[in-house]
């Protein structure tokens, strides 16, 4: 797939999977699962939306991808605040998550504009 949003989301998901090994503290397995699922959901939903084309369903999957990016950012911020993820690991992932969310948002805006014409 040649979408920048998908490429960056895929790279982010791989980094989150690797970074999740640094999580520590109580309920680390549950936290790791939530973080990884949210991260992997982003490129998966971009791909599904792209696969459905310029239509309402495509836009819906891009909306889910954008929401998953917001969820991932929240999990990363909570993990950092709770001391479960070191700031040196959390902050770059948060910055990349925000970038991916912005790219997905712009893609969604583009699809919605095409749908309205």
Where are these predicted regions, by residue range?
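Amphipathic alpha-helical assembly/interaction segments
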Residues: 1-117
């Amino acid at each position: 797939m040649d979408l920048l949003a998908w490429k960056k989301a895929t790279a982010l998901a791989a980094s989150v999977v690797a970074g999740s090994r640094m999580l520590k503290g109580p309920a680390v397995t549950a936290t790791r699962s939530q973080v990884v699922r949210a991260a992997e959901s982003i490129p998966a939903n971009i791909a599904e939306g792209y696969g459905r084309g310029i239509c309402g369903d495509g836009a819906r999957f891009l909306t889910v991808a954008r929401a998953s990016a917001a969820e991932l950012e929240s999990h990363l911020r909570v993990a950092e605040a709770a001391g479960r993820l070191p700031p040196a690991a959390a902050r770059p992932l948060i910055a990349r998550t925000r970038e991916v969310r912005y790219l997905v948002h712009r893609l969604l805006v583009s699809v919605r504009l095409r749908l309205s014409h």
